[in-house]
Amino acid sequence: MATATTTATAAFSGVVSVGTETRRIYSFSHLQPSAAFPAKPSSFKSLKLKQSARLTRRLDHRPFVVRCEASSSNGRLTQQEFTEMAWQSIVSSPDVAKENKQQIVETEHLMKALLEQKNGLARRIFSKIGVDNTKVLEATEKFIQRQPKVYGDAAGSMLGRDLEALFQRARQFKKDLKDSYVSVEHLVLAFADDKRFGKQLFKDFQISERSLKSAIESIRGKQSVIDQDPEGKYEALEKYGKDLTAMAREGKLDPVIGRDDEIRRCIQILSRRTKNNPVLIGEPGVGKTAISEGLAQRIVQGDVPQALMNRKLISLDMGALIAGAKYRGEFEDRLKAVLKEVTDSEGQIILFIDEIHTVVGAGATNGAMDAGNLLKPMLGRGELRCIGATTLDEYRKYIEKDPALERRFQQVYVDQPTVEDTISILRGLRERYELHHGVRISDSALVEAAILSDRYISGRFLPDKAIDLVDEAAAKLKMEITSKPTALDELDRSVIKLEMERLSLTNDTDKASRERLNRIETELVLLKEKQAELTEQWEHERSVMSRLQSIKEEIDRVNLEIQQAEREYDLNRAAELKYGSLNSLQRQLNEAEKELNEYLSSGKSMFREEVLGSDIAEIVSKWTGIPVSKLQQSERDKLLHLEEELHKRVVGQNPAVTAVAEAIQRSRAGLSDPGRPIASFMFMGPTGVGKTELAKALASYMFNTEEALVRIDMSEYMEKHAVSRLIGAPPGYVGYEEGGQLTETVRRRPYSVILFDEIEKAHGDVFNVFLQILDDGRVTDSQGRTVSFTNTVIIMTSNVGSQFILNNTDDDANELSYETIKERVMNAARSIFRPEFMNRVDEYIVFKPLDREQINRIVRLQLARVQKRIADRKMKINITDAAVDLLGSLGYDPNYGARPVKRVIQQNIENELAKGILRGDFKEEDGILIDTEVTAFSNGQLPQQKLTFKKIESETADAEQEEAAFSK
């Protein structure tokens, strides 16, 4: 037997004489293997005629091999003269004959083998003509079923005369078309003159030889069969690409709003003589692919220069091109076929490669050329017009490393659109999303989607994240509409529950059960009436909405037909549709909308059918975890109440809080420079007076979460080289890929409060980074990315000059004005910080030491936090003014501010409460009164004031709880 690398030859020979009649016997026979095709088809195992012993005995008692001249040249049918798909069908045809118990392999068996090939060329040819392949296969099978059958091993062992003649005709077609191998299309053409089966089949399906040739020509293009796998290269663009212009013509692409400058620049580059290849570079989600779709729509509408008129824009699918390429060189063959089709079109086809960085290195194994190197010559000479799209990071990582490839592309930067532009884009897409989901989308929802996504969803880019919000909100509403309403669902469950109860009571005979049964039956009648009413109402509402959606879909289809008619200058058809069908549909739509609106306004409606701003806020809340109520609070309300909200958390420091609130209000009203941060402050004062607390309060109120506070401790930046930690390590150093501590945080969360704590402790060179942040609102990180600080509030804290504040006695502090103290502190700051740094800070705010009264207020704030923690045990703390005064006096120290208060409360309140709970003195739902008492004079010790903890009687506690609930 032949090995996998050798091939067997099927030979047919001999004329056998029986009496006066001469008969030609056709049989497959294993001869000496030759190097053409693997000798493993199962149907060729019976090639020796010892398996046809009965036939041999009839002719001659001597054993011999029957042969027949089936080939005009060497008497052999070899794989070398056929393409792989053609040979596969020839090898499969004996199997078809064997399955149908037929001895002679004929043309109908070959036709069935051709039609059963997955993605076969024969199927593509018939589809091109407009013939249903399934029906052709059914007709072939019917013909096969009518042929005589034989039983035994002889099935499928002989080659028919008509099949032999078909091979001869196929060879002739190969010569006529100047091909090197007999391919599937030659075999299909040969069926046109097949007197046994093919001619009648083609006649039944009205297939002529001319239509076959034109279909083959459109599939093959200008290609010739020069290797044994040409079928895989036919219509390569159709197989591995999507025609964007065809999709635009059919209305399958979403409208592209704006982006006129980028599309115009692409057209400009495509119109060049050489290097006419734009590459769209931008962050993911900014609309790079949409620009190519916008160009396709313009080509279809004829809104392009003559150089691009009637061109085809094909999007190449690199995944499909690489997938399934098992052997070395197969991927390159596919790509070459695609490129050949593009170049043969003589500029009629423009290629669009999304994620073009995948081309670099694609297909390269063990020194083989990658796809990028195959593209370079064509890109440089202008033979291939290609539009690429990739992100900034991937462009830098892959394409910039290959300068020869990079210089063949012209860069087109695609920036993130503004919030206003995003709203325009959403308005343009609204109709498509309304049509898909079958709901209405309000304009307020679109505005909310753009604003909230920009403010709260970091790490993603507009318009993609805003479109996703609208899409998800519409999907959520659609799900609510299609599922059963809550009221009806509860009613159904009540009916089922009562039905089960009625069944269980049916067999009980006692009086109570009977009465209960009667009550249940009465209740069931009422519930079922209500259920039927609600079900009818729900079905009616759904039917109105589905009718509305079907009318909208019909209007969309008619609009598409009008556009096509106008493009083809069929003005009669366009006018008929526009003033006939469209007007009629518009009237129906208005009537249906009026009916639905009346139904909704009547108050009977069981669900909403419009996406509102609250729906968008709910989705943002799900994505980010920020409470919905805070998301929906308007910006204006926040700004108006900013000062009083800050005072709730920051005790005293009126000048500081007022200055911060005014700076924020000024910025948000649009009176500040849009190219700078919202505001920049330098908080100066002694420790523990509320500098960091004010920054936390501002972040929490402005951006709805304390996590929006980015705190950077400047004591970690005391060395000169530490500045690289802020903006990222330079190339070649450890941590280059990770980015900077400051820049990465702001890129991920652009709306934030940045707190640089203890700024005077940083090295002098660190301040050089702050200069451009404070002045231009941006900084360039180590990887060349520009990070914007225009939506941040920058706060720096410093203890510089605190000695001037603390050294004043209470009397002096009253005499000295705030401005005098501030002037002294500023002079101290000027001696430390450079003038160019100080000149860029918006406002310097000096914090004064806290007095006794303010410390007492802080005590109450800290005790409120203790109360929150102990509330889990359902306990309540009541504290007297005397106890607050005592804690205030214990925690008061002008040099340390409010920080000692926390320690005093921990030692005197929390420790005692913990001991009382562990001893069992205080239990759940107990009220605890914290008061003071004066100790008696004993053992020479003076009387002292100390805290006492008493358990309040339960009645008193209950009364207090009731009073508190009533007041709430």
From Swiss-Prot:
Residues 1-67 form a transit peptide. Residues 78-222 form the Clp R domain. ATP binds at residues 282-289, 685-692. Residues 611-802 are annotated as: II. The keyword Chloroplast applies. Induction: By heat stress. Disruption phenotype: Seedling lethal when grown on soil. On agar plates supplied with sucrose, seedlings grow slowly with a chlorotic phenotype. They display irregular and small chloroplasts without starch grains in the stroma and with disorganized grana stacks and undeveloped thylakoid membranes. Residues 82-147 are annotated as: Repeat 1. SUPFAM superfamilies: Double Clp-N motif (SSF81923), P-loop containing nucleoside triphosphate hydrolases (SSF52540). GO terms for molecular function: ATP binding; ATP hydrolysis activity. InterPro entries: AAA+_ATPase, ATPase_AAA_core, Chaperonin_ClpB, Clp_ATPase_C, Clp_N_dom_sf, Clp_R_dom, ClpA/B, ClpA/B_CS1. Gene3D superfamilies: 1.10.8.60, Clp, N-terminal domain, P-loop containing nucleotide triphosphate hydrolases. Keywords: ATP-binding, Chaperone, Chloroplast, Coiled coil, Nucleotide-binding, Plastid, Repeat, Stress response, Transit peptide. One of its GO terms (cellular component) is chloroplast stroma. Signal peptide: none annotated. Residues 237-485 are annotated as: I. One of its GO terms (biological process) is response to heat. Residues 159-222 are annotated as: Repeat 2. Residues 488-606 form a coiled coil. Plants overexpressing CLPB3 show inhibition of chloroplast development and a mild pale-green phenotype. Belongs to the ClpA/ClpB family. Molecular chaperone essential for chloroplast development and seedling viability. Mediates internal thylakoid membrane formation and confers thermotolerance to chloroplasts during heat stress. This is Chaperone protein ClpB3, chloroplastic.
